[in-house]
UniProtKB/Swiss-Prot annotation:
It comes from Heliothis virescens. GO terms for cellular component: extracellular region. It is found in: Secreted. The keyword Secreted applies. This is Attacin.
Length: 24
């Protein structure tokens, strides 16, 4: 289940980045 493991890790790492980018 490589997809399941990469999904949360990728989302968690991009979620904060996206929020900061959207705010800026």
């Amino acid at each position: 289940t490589p997809d399941h493991r990469e999904v949360p890790s990728f989302s968690s790492r991009w979620e904060p980045n996206f929020g900061l980018t959207f705010s800026k």
